[in-house]
């Protein structure tokens, strides 16, 4: 898929639209840090929609997004930040590629202790702060379904540093 997009007619068409002023930015959506990094390295994209949360940031990269939610993945102990994700975030920051975050709550799993790989629930404010403090992150799409969920997400705007602090959740990760 990567070569079909970046080596074909599609990218040429998109570049023409940008040059003509019909679009302002070229973006890409991905769940895989290796593919996303490769796209950023082309120098063609301006914005990357990417899944950012502490759960996914510790998992190995994969083409299959469904594996991010697999029980066997959550049952494993991950001890380190995924180096591919770290390299992607740093590259985006250096190149001025904005990251628009999706899946900040890991599909809701991070908000429930029994589903979180950390064994402890994060608050929406903590999950949003985690995402917003990664390099190159410009925005987070919280994925709210109800008015109450919107209020919980907006609470980040007035939250204290103590309310934003997610260290107590990540402290449950075993050390190397």
Which stretches of residues belong to each language-model region?
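Beta/alpha (TIM)-barrel catalytic core signal, keyed to glycine-rich beta->alpha loops juxtaposed to Asp/Glu
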Residues: 1-176
């Amino acid at each position: 898929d990567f070569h079909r997009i970046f080596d074909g007619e599609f990218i040429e068409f998109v570049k023409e639209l940008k040059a003509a002023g019909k679009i302002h930015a070229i973006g890409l959506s991905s769940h895989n840090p290796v593919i996303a990094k490769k796209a950023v390295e082309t120098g063609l994209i301006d914005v990357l929609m990417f899944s950012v949360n502490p759960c996914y940031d510790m998992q190995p990269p994969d083409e299959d997004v469904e594996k991010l939610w697999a029980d066997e993945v959550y049952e494993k102990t991950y001890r380190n930040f995924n180096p591919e994700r770290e390299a992607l975030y740093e590259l985006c920051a250096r190149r001025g590629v904005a990251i628009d975050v999706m899946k900040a709550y890991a599909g809701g799993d991070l908000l429930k202790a029994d589903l979180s790989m950390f064994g402890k629930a994060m608050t929406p404010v903590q999950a949003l702060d985690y995402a917003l403090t990664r390099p190159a992150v410009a925005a987070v799409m919280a994925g709210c379904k109800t008015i109450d969920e919107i209020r919980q997400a907006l609470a980040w705007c007035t939250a204290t540093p103590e309310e934003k602090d997610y260290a107590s959740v990540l402290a449950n990760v075993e050390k190397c």
